[in-house]
């Protein structure tokens, strides 16, 4: 018996199945890189290998997770597919207190009361940004004024749900090139198109246009459960010539507001991640609170 198998036995995590994992996720939710539809996509379309585990307490399954390709908890492929790897939120019951037998240094701060063998501040540097529960009236007024100015300059808004997968792929690649030029590589076009096509139902948010031409698009993915809805901005791109109109700020505000309304209508908790905090991304502090990600010690 391997050491890792012994660790799982000692910490009460049992071998499980994809079917059971989906059920647990549907109940408790998790980050988009743990979503069963994403898992299913990589199992069927890319022949990736997954091992599933669940935690049972008082004859009730309280949590589940998987190991991808015998390496990681979560699907970590941010350079080739539009999936964030900034944090991992494992589907767990709110009252679960357990030891996690596998290593990761990307645990969501929301797991701090749940996972006993993790550190959250000592030697930790990486912080993930979760959108604030509310903004000040001054902040909201500034965003509304930006939006009205944008509309008066010929701006318009379209839902990603109304765009085809090919259209979304073309828009994102063009805007990405405009934003980064040759300084950063975009996702392979075939990967992006196939991902959008197969997982279109997980896409959320808007695209901004100026005089009918796309000027801003954030890839926002939605992970919904019975308890909460987790939104994740995996990447974004804007048209450089439109920067004076603040399209990035307007788009963020519109997407967050739409996410809030979506959750309010369904009476579910909102979780909205805008990724890691870096010195060049200090603007994220306007929108969010940074939290250290946790590292499991095992």
Predicted regions span which residues?
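A conserved beta-strand-loop-helix scaffold within acyl/acetyltransferase catalytic domains
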Residues: 2-59, 66-72, 116-120, 133-243
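Short, composition-biased local secondary-structure segments
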Residues: 27-28, 112-122, 249-254
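Short catalytic/ligand-binding loop motif for oxyanion handling, primarily in non-cytosolic enzymes
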Residues: 62-63, 72-76, 281-283
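Short, solvent-exposed cationic patches
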Residues: 76-100, 235-247
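Non-catalytic accessory segments adjacent to catalytic cores
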Residues: 83-125
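Well-ordered, non-membrane alpha-helical segments in soluble/globular domains
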Residues: 84-86, 92-93, 103-104, 139-143, ...
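Aromatic (often tryptophan-rich) hydrophobic motifs at membrane interfaces
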Residues: 202-298
């Amino acid at each position: 018996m391997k050491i890792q198998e012994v660790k799982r036995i000692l910490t009460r995590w049992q071998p499980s199945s994809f079917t059971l994992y989906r059920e647990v996720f549907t109940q408790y939710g998790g980050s988009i890189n743990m979503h069963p539809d994403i898992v299913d996509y990589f199992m069927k379309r890319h022949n990736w290998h997954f091992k599933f585990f669940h935690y049972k307490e008082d004859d009730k399954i309280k949590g589940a997770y998987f190991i991808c390709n015998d390496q990681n908890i979560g699907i970590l492929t941010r350079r080739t597919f539009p999936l964030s790897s900034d944090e991992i939120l494992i589907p767990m019951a709110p009252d679960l207190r357990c030891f996690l037998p596998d290593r990761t240094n990307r645990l969501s701060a929301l797991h701090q009361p749940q996972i006993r063998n993790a550190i959250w501040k000592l030697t930790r540097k990486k912080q993930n940004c979760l959108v604030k529960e509310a903004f000040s009236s001054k902040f909201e007024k500034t965003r509304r004024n930006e939006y009205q100015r944008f509309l008066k300059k010929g701006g318009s808004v379209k839902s990603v749900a109304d765009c085809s997968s090919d259209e979304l792929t073309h828009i994102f690649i063009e805007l990405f090139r405009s934003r980064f030029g040759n300084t950063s590589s975009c996702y392979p076009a075939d990967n992006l198109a196939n991902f959008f096509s197969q997982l279109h139902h997980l896409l959320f948010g808007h695209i901004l246009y100026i005089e009918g031409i796309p000027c801003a698009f954030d890839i926002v993915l939605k992970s919904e459960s019975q308890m909460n809805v987790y939104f994740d901005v995996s990447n974004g791109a804007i048209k450089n010539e439109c920067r004076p109109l603040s399209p990035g700020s307007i788009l963020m505000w519109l997407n967050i507001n739409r996410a809030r309304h979506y959750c309010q209508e369904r009476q579910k908790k909102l979780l909205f991640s805008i990724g890691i905090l870096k010195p060049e991304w200090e603007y994220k502090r306007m929108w969010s609170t940074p939290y250290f990600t946790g590292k499991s010690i095992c």
